[in-house]
Amino acid sequence: MVSMFWLLATFAYLLGSLSFAILLSRLSGRPDPRASGSGNAGATNMLRLAGKKLAILTLLGDLCKGLLPILIASAWNLNIAQQGWIGVCAVLGHLFPVYFRFRGGKGVATAAGVLLGLYPPAAALAIAAWLLTLYLTRTSSLAALIATPLTLPLLAWQEPHALLPMSVLTLLIVWRHRGNLRDLLAGRERHF
C-alpha cells in the first residue's frame, strides 16, 4: 500500500495542478486570472472576470480535483491519514501547479473537495460557515479564513487521524491568504 500511496499522492498533485480558472479563461478568450482582477486563479476571481457560468465551472472543477483522489484512495482502502496527505498533495498542486509555472490559486475549493471525500460533515460545516461569512461580510477571503480552521475541532473529535494532514492543509490556505489578511487588517480587502 505504500507504493499505492505515493502513486496517488503524485496523481493528486498532477490533477491539482490543472487550473480550471486558467484553462477556462483561455478557452473562452478571457484574460488570465493571474494577471487580472485579484490576480488569483480561482472561482471568486473568475466570477469577477468572466461571470457566473465560468465561475461555477471553475468551482466544480477545483472541488472535484480535491475529491477524486480521496475517493480513489478510499476505494484502495488507504487509511484516513494517507487519504488526508493525498488531499494535501491535491491542494499543493492547486497552489503550485507544475503546468502553469507554479502560479496557482488559493486552494479553498480544492480543500472543500478533500474534506467532502474525507469526512462530509466537515465539508458541510466549512461550506455553511463560508456561505454565512460571505453573506454577512461580502468578503470571500474572510469566509475562507474562518471556514477552513473551523473544521479542525470536528475532525479532531470524529477523525483524529486526519487532523495532522488537515491542519497542514489549513495552514497552507491561511498562508496563501496572507496578503488578504494584511488587506483585511488595513481595511482594503475587496468585497462583493
Swiss-Prot record:
Membrane topology: Multi-pass membrane protein
Biological pathway: Lipid metabolism; phospholipid metabolism
Transmembrane segments: 4-24, 54-74, 80-100, 112-132, 154-174
GO molecular function, one term: acyl-phosphate glycerol-3-phosphate acyltransferase activity
Coiled coil: none
Enzyme class: transferase
Subcellular location: Cell inner membrane
Entry GO terms, CC: plasma membrane
Catalytic activity: an acyl phosphate + sn-glycerol 3-phosphate = a 1-acyl-sn-glycero-3-phosphate + phosphate
Family annotation (Pfam families): G3P_acyltransf (PF02660)
Biological process according to GO: phospholipid biosynthetic process
Keywords: Cell inner membrane, Cell membrane, Lipid biosynthesis, Lipid metabolism, Membrane, Phospholipid biosynthesis, Phospholipid metabolism, Transferase, Transmembrane, Transmembrane helix
Documented EC number(s): 2.3.1.275
HAMAP family per UniProt: PlsY (MF_01043)
Role this protein plays: Catalyzes the transfer of an acyl group from acyl-phosphate (acyl-PO(4)) to glycerol-3-phosphate (G3P) to form lysophosphatidic acid (LPA). This enzyme utilizes acyl-phosphate as fatty acyl donor, but not acyl-CoA or acyl-ACP.
Family named by the database record: Belongs to the PlsY family.
Subunit structure: Probably interacts with PlsX.
Protein name as catalogued: Glycerol-3-phosphate acyltransferase
Species of provenance: Pseudomonas savastanoi pv. phaseolicola (strain 1448A / Race 6)
Organism taxonomic ancestry: Bacteria, Pseudomonadati, Pseudomonadota, Gammaproteobacteria, Pseudomonadales
